[in-house]
Each structure stands twice: as structure tokens, then as C-alpha cells.
């Protein structure tokens, strides 16, 4: 049962992941939006249907997710934007959160120098200065074609009229209710015992979005909305000031770009670790011709795990905010360096993470998240990953504004060598400093094949984002899968420390698990979980699109068929 609706005399099909296989074979897709929620995908495709571009649809989709996907969609967080124009120009915008001006390197340590549990993850002191709204206006000023008022109005209507709670969302609300109440009190909006099928109306969010609609960027970063934010952060122990908000600016950055066989891959540069890490992984596996092995075979998993292990080790030492630290990008992606990194790989036994230190290089002078992918009929493409960091961020809910604030400060290294909430270890390169951007794993990525747009891909998943994007691209271009099949396929993950291979539960043959263990791999079945929720679009040689919306969530694709 596809849902069809008509906008501007164009027939549009809204497809849940379980319906994609029913797409008529005689119909070709010319535009698509794939996101974490049906409502957001539908709003995004409606913007394309009325003549907007992928950049217009990006803004509308993002704002819709802020309403109906509050655990990660946001105006109180930040994100990364990767784009490719129809004529092949590629760029990125960094609207990652920043540390407040009052932040300090040891702000989460006790008098003995130990990390205070929960201080960087829960409550006002965990909140970084939000960048989402500034990012959306920056994108609109450079690339938008429709009025901003047109792009924000569907989200205002969605907040005011309400969205329907799904079963997965109801479970999510319930799982965090205790923390919502602890920080915000019993009457807070998302502590109200919602069940699947209930409608959530958020009038406060509608009013906030109207302020942004009417006053532009200043509607969030100054005036009553900003004052409400600062007061709520202060009341819950935080240090963000009005000056922090007024001084926030996004940054256009040069993307990470590397080649793998006949693919040209663009991804986010630091302060994202994603582009460098997948660049390292692809180049480390390239000599092994993964396509000769069956998908998720012992051999393929061995090679990929060992590449993941070594890349995450480098991540821990070298990566941070390029505006504050020098990052040896070229050296980290140098093929000779990466060949040396893989030289210790042994088919007969697992490497030990204790033996795999971050590499020695020559310096040269760069968990809960949501991703969406968009391609328009003109050939423009957008990959966006946006986040509050943990699910519902700091759990600080600005009641008068109707939105959650991030806990992005946890993505700094509170103390070198001590893992964050995702188990990732960092160094002084990612130490806290005033107005510094924290390191991220978000990996929005665009792939070209033989010079033409081929894939738009990304995922949430904290530390597993990088490996999920890596494996999804390989699933298509090495293992011959279609887009939905590649998204559905079981995933695995290794991040150097802890020294464990994480497998999605119930998805891998026990014989394969035993074979890995026999070679010395620690397969941490007790920690197995869903890994990533990939939303992606594949473009074939005739420029027809196919979509992959991850069934691990409530993700959905909305498409426009060719006439």
C-alpha cells in the first residue's frame, strides 16, 4: 500500500522501506528524499515538486525532523552538509556546535583529575552552542531558490497540528522518561507516557519556528528565543551566554576527497573524523580486491575489521578542530603510509589493538544522530547528518521553545585516553577549548562513478557511523547489491578500543562467529546492537534513482517518478 499524493499536478509516491520492492518496474525515479521520518521525507519531496532544488528541500526536511524526530532532529544541535551541484561542484558546510566561551579544558574533572560521570552528557553543562539554525540560513543565502518562509512553514504546521508517534518512537520516549523528568520536571512535553498512535502537538516549537521565519537567523540567536535558551541552560547548570549565541558562525570547508577504483568519493573534513577515516579504510582494503570474496565472509570481514581498527587508532591521536590544531590530512591519506599500517595484517590471526598504536606520520601543514539524502530532478545532490549527540542530547528541554538541547560537549576529550559515551578515545587534539568545535564521527558522503553522480549516503550511529557508511558503499560497488539491499545488509563494527568486533544481533552465522574467534577476534555478542540507520540514494548510468531507507528505524523514502 503505497501512499500517493499530488502536489502541483505531479504524482508523488511515499514509500516505506517495506514497500520499496513494490515500486512499478516501468516507472523511473527522477527525484528522491530519504530520511528518518515519513513526515520529513514527504515535506522534502513536496518542496522538490513545486520546483525547489535539493538545497531548498534540505532546509524543509531538516526543520521537519526537528519537529517529528526530537531525539536527533533539531534546532538545538548542529550538523554537516555535503553537496554536489548538477555540474559537479562539491563543497561542505560545517555547522557543528562549539564550546561556550566560558568552557575550559578541565571543566569535567574533579579535584583529583578524574572525569565526573555524567557531567558532559546530562544537563546544562553538557550543551554546546547550537549551529543548526545558522547553518540553514547560510545554505539558503548561498544556494536557496525558494523563500525561507516557504521552506519553514511545513514544519510550523507539523508542530502545531501534530505528528503521530510510532511504536519505536514510543519505546524511545519511555526509555528516556526518567531523565526527562530529572532535568525538566514531570510536566515536560515528552514525559507524558505517549503510546504508538498518539499525536504530539508542540505549540511552543511552532512559535519558535515562527520567530525564526519572521526574524531570520536573529529569531533564534537573539531576542526572546535566545533568552529562553540561555536561562534554561543556566537553570540546569550550564554556561552558554547570549554572546555565545550571537557570535556563532558556520564554516565552509573543503571536502575530503579520495579515489577507490573507479569511484571518486567526497566526505566531510575535520572536525568530522568521517572523511579521513573512510578514506583510510578504502585505501587500506584496496589491495585485497574484496569483490573476490562473498559478502560478510570471513575473509572480507577480516580485511575490513583490520582497516577499521587501524583507522580508529589514528582518529584517537590526530583529529580535532582544524581551526585550533594542525591535522596532517595528506599524510593520513597517503597510500604509502596506509600500506605500512596494514603491513602487520596476518590472515591467520587477529591483530591486537594493544599492538596497534596510532601511526607515526610526517606532519604537513586539516550515538544519536540523523541523516538524510536528497537528489533533485536537476541532478543536485545533498547529504546531511545532524545531531544532538546522545538521544535527546543533554535531555534539557527548553519548554518555552519546544526543543531539546545537545550534549555535544561529550564529544571533546574530557581527559586524554578516557572514552566518551560512545567508547571513543581522544587526545589533546580534541581537548576542550573556548569556541572550539568538538570532533565528530558524522560522515555525510557523496560518491561519483566514472565522473558521474552515483550515490548519496550517510547514517546516524555515534562511533558506528563511519563503518556503516564504509560498508554500505562496498555493498554496492564491490558486492553488487542494489541500494535497498545494501542498506538492509547486516553490519559489523570495530573501533580499535575496546578491542571487540561488534555484530548486529542474530544476523551472522554462528559458524562465522566461531571462525573469527578461532583466529583471535573478540566477538562481543553481549554488546551486539543495531548498527547505523543508513539512508541513501543510488544513481545509475541513465540517471535513474533508487533508494535505501533503513528498516532498523522508521525511515522512509519519498520519490517523484519521471513522466
For the regions a language model picked out, list residue spans one by one.
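Active-site rim segments in enzyme catalytic domains, especially the processed small/beta chain
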Residues: 67-92, 239-241, 381-449, 479, ...
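Bacterial N-terminal signal peptides that target proteins for export
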Residues: 1-11
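Noncatalytic scaffold domains of N-terminal-nucleophile
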Residues: 25-42, 46, 54-216, 220-222, ...
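C-terminal motif of bacterial Sec signal peptides marking the signal peptidase cleavage site
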Residues: 20-21
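Internal maturation/activation junctions in enzymes
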Residues: 287-388, 397-401, 416-417, 425, ...
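Extended C-terminal subregions enriched in glycine
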Residues: 436, 478-529
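Short beta-strand scaffold segments in enzyme catalytic cores
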Residues: 73-74, 78-85, 370-374, 444-446, ...
Amino acid at each position: 500500500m503505497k501512499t500517493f499524493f499530488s502536489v502541483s499536478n505531479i504524482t508523488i509516491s511515499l514509500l516505506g522501506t517495506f514497500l520499496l520492492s513494490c515500486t512499478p518496474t516501468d516507472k523511473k525515479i527522477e527525484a528522491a528524499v530519504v530520511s528518518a521520518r515519513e513526515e520529513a521525507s514527504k515535506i522534502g519531496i513536496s518542496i522538490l515538486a513545486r520546483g525547489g532544488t535539493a538545497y531548498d528541500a534540505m532546509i524543509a526536511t531538516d526543520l521537519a525532523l526537528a519537529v517529528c524526530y526530537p531525539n536527533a532532529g533539531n534546532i538545538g544541535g548542529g550538523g554537516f552538509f555535503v553537496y554536489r551541484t548538477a555540474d559537479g561542484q562539491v563543497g561542505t558546510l560545517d555547522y557543528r556546535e562549539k564550546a561556550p566561551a566560558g568552557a575550559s579544558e578541565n571543566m569535567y574533572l574533579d579535584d583529583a583529575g578524574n572525569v565526573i560521570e555524567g557531567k558532559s552528557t546530562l544537563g546544562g553543562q553538557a550543551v554546546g552552542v547550537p549551529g543548526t539554525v545558522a547553518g540553514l540560513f547560510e545554505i539558503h543565502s548561498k544556494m536557496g531558490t525558494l523563500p525561507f518562509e516557504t521552506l519553514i512553514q511545513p514544519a510550523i504546521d507539523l508542530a502545531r497540528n501534530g505528528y503521530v508517534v510510532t511504536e519505536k518512537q514510543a519505546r524511545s520516549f519511555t526509555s528516556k522518561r526518567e531523565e526527562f523528568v530529572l532535568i525538566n520536571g514531570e510536566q515536560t512535553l515528552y514525559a507524558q507516557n505517549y503510546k504508538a498512535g498518539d499525536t504530539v502537538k508542540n505549540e511552543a516549537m511552532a512559535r519558535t519556528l515562527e520567530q525564526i521565519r519572521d526574524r531570520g537567523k536573529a529569531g533564534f540567536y537573539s531576542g526572546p528565543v535566545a533568552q529562553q535558551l540561555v536561562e534554561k541552560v543556566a537553570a540546569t547548570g550550564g554556561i552558554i551566554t547570549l554572546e555565545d549565541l550571537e557570535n556563532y558562525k558556520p564554516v565552509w570547508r573543503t571536502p575530503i576527497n579520495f579515489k577507490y577504483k573507479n569511484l571518486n568519493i567526497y566526505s566531510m573534513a575535520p572536525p568530522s573524523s568521517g572523511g579521513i577515516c573512510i578514506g583510510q579504510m578504502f585505501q587500506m582494503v584496496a589491495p585485497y580486491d574484496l569483490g573476490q570474496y562473498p559478502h560478510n565472509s570471513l575473509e572480507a570481514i577480516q580485511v575490513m575489521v583490520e582497516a577499521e581498527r587501524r583507522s580508529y587508532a589514528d582518529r584517537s591521536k590526530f583529529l580535532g578542530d582544524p581551526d585550533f590544531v594542525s591535522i596532517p590530512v595528506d599524510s593520513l591519506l597517503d597510500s604509502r603510509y596506509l600500506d605500512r599500517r596494514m603491513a602487520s595484517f596476518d590472515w591467520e590471526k587477529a591483530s591486537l589493538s594493544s599492538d596497534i598504536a596510532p601511526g607515526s606520520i610526517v606532519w604537513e601543514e586539516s550515538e544519536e544522530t540523523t541523516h538524510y539524502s536528497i537528489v533533485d530532478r536537476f541532478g543536485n545532490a545533498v547529504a546531511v547528518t545532524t545531531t544532538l549527540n546522545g538521544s535527546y542530547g543533554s535531555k534539557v528541554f527548553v519548554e518555552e521553545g519546544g526543543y531539546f538541547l545537545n550534549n555535544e560537549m561529550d564529544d571533546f576529550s574530557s581527559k586524554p585516553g578516557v572514552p566518551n559515551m560512545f567508547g571513543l578515545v581522544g587526545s589533546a587534539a580534541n581537548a576542550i577549548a573556548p569556541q572550539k568545535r568538538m570532533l565528530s564521527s558524522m560522515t555525510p558522503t557523496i560518491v561519483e562513478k566514472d565522473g558521474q553522480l552515483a550515490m548519496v549516503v550517510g547514517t546516524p550511529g555515534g562511533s558506528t557511523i563511519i563503518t556503516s557508511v564504509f560498508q554500505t558503499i562496498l555493498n554496492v560497488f564491490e558486492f553488487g547489491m542494489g541500494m535497498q539491499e545494501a542498506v538492509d545488509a547486516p553490519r559489523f563494527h570495530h573501533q580499535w578500543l575496546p578491542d571487540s568486533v561488534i555484530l548486529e544481533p542474530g544476523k551472522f552465522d554462528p559458524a562465522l562467529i566461531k571462525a573469527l574467534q578461532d583466529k583471535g577476534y573478540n566477538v562481543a555478542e553481549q554488546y551486539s546492537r543495531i548498527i547505523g540507520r543508513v539512508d541513501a540514494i543510488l544513481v545509475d548510468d541513465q540517471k535513474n534513482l533508487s533508494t535505501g531507507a533503513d528498516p532498523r528505524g522508521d525511515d522512509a523514502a519519498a520519490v517523484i517518478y519521471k513522466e
